[in-house]
Structures are given as C-alpha cells and as structure tokens.
Amino acid sequence: MIIIKNIISVIIFIFLFGCIQPNEESVWSVTEDTVLATEGFCRNISVRGDIAYVAAGQSGVQVWDLGQGIQLHGFLGYSQDGSYLEFDDIALVQRDEDNELIFVTESNKKVKVFRFGVDNEFIYRNEIMSDRTKDFISFHREGNRFTMFVADNDDGLKWGTYRSDTTTVFNLEIINWMPSSGGEVTTDGKPLGIDSDGISMVAMAVDQLGVEFYSFDTLGAEPTLRSRFDLDGNAEQVNLSDIGAFVSCDDFGAYFLSNKLIEMGQGAAVSFAEDLTVDHISTHGDIAVLSLGPKGIALYDISDPSNPEPRGIFDVGYVYRSQFWNDRLLLCTRAGLKILTINS
C-alpha cells in the first residue's frame, strides 16, 4: 500500500511540475547583443528609427544611437526663467519628431514639454496636464498640434489637443503649448497605465478595479466609456495590439482580452502567468514579453492568444519594461538599456 501511495505521489508531482514549467524542447533562448550603459537607471524609452530617448531617473534625459551604440546627448536639467533646474526623477519620456518635441514626466508630476530640434538644443516650453500623471501617450496632429491622453491618478482619464502659441514680451519671444480642446472622464479606480491606438480607442489600467476601454470618433474628440473589466490583482499597465489588449496585474500575472470581448463588454478574460509578478507587457507578432522586475523577463508564445504558452524565464537583471526595435528586444533595466535577440 505504501509503495502504491508513493507511486501516486510521484505521478501527481510530475503532473503539477509539468503544468508549471514549459517543456524543455519548447523553451526559447535569448542572446544579449549589447548593453548601453546609461547613467542612472533606464526607466523608460521612446524609440524613433534608430534613436532612443531614455528616461534615466535622477540622471535626466539621454539620447542614444541604437545602431552605433553611443550616447549622443544627455540632459541633467534645463533652464527656466534664467535659472538652471535639475531633474528630480524622470520616469517617462516620449518623442514627437514632427513637432520637434520631447515630453517627460517626473514621478506624479505634470508633463514637461521641451523643444529638441536639429540644433540639438533642449529648450523648456511649459508644463501641461495633471499633477498626478502616472502615464501618458501622445499623437502628432497636422498644423503644429498634438493630442495627449493621460492616466491621472486622482481624476481619471484626461485628454487634450495642444497647439503652439507664440507671444512677445519686452521683445522676447515666448513659445508655449496651449490647449485648444480637452477634458476628463472620472473613474472610481486609480489610473496607473494608459495606451491608445490613436484611431478610435483608449485603454486604461485602473489598479484594483481592472481595466477600462474608451472609444472616440476622431482623434481629439471626447472619449466615451465602452467597457470595463474587473480583474484579479492590481492592473498596472495595458498594451493594445491588433488582436486585443494585454494587461499586467502585478502579483496576479497577466490577462488577455480579445477585441471581440472588449466590444461585447462582458465575458471572461484569459489569465496566464498567474505565478509571476508582472509589471509590464510588450508584444510583437506571436511573442509576448513580460517584465518581472528583479526576476528579469518571461517569454510567452501568443500564436493562440486564448492559450498563451510559456517559453521560459530569463534572469537578465532588474527589468522595468521592454519594447521591440525591428526584430530585436530593448530592455529598460537598472544596468542600462539592453538589446537582446529572442531565439524562438
């Protein structure tokens, strides 16, 4: 009887272990091609072509050439009203090439607008949006304009369309970016992350209340709530893709919501990576990259998004988030900006 019980225990263990760990034959691998040693932690990036704009925490904003692997510029602060001000802690950055702008935010502060043109001068313009900005995304508009969506941790979803405004005071030309339209939609949740396709949809991660989806007729028009999904855990970031949305939910792993599910506004989201703490998700084709903080990254095969398959966990340092650059993977880490190749 004891022998039989031991055999049964072994069978159960093998079954459970096999469910948790991917089959060794199906595990992918990664190759670390380059590490760009940014000054300070590489917290966030915005990539345009082969140029990366890096949010480097207390080390400010840095501009890197990814192809050559060299730093082109670094800005620890900026001049405002005759004084030089150092950055406290840059958390987010985004580049608007058409308007020659760089947007940056420090933790829980407004979005700062800087001009950065062909002369490579980093010129402060003004601040926009909310004092409690957690995340933002911006889209260029014709006629020297842009439209921005913001996850405001106090007020909800904010949006606005801004235009360049020039005034002259004592023969001094002052250029600011002023709102021409905008507003906000309140939510019971605490917005943490935001994404938009720039065409008709905005998605916002709202902490303990899950994820919300908003639709708009044209870019710059008022978004209206389309659907809301209450997910386990704390929804921190959301990534919109062609097939739906991927949501990172901290200690409760990740979720996938198909476009059909979002449109219907009801049904069960697909949960995966339940045993992992997921801070951020990026996707490219059939690959999903989950950022795990101190545990590195986890790779998933999402060729069947209704059943994501694990393809391995890789200790590549402390990872904040990831982004695909052509067919390679960029990792924002405490050791700098890492460039990897995924061997699938």
Model region roles, listed by residue range:
Residues 1-18:
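Sec-dependent bacterial lipoprotein signal peptides
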Residues 19-344:
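Feature marking well-ordered beta-strand scaffolds used for ligand recognition
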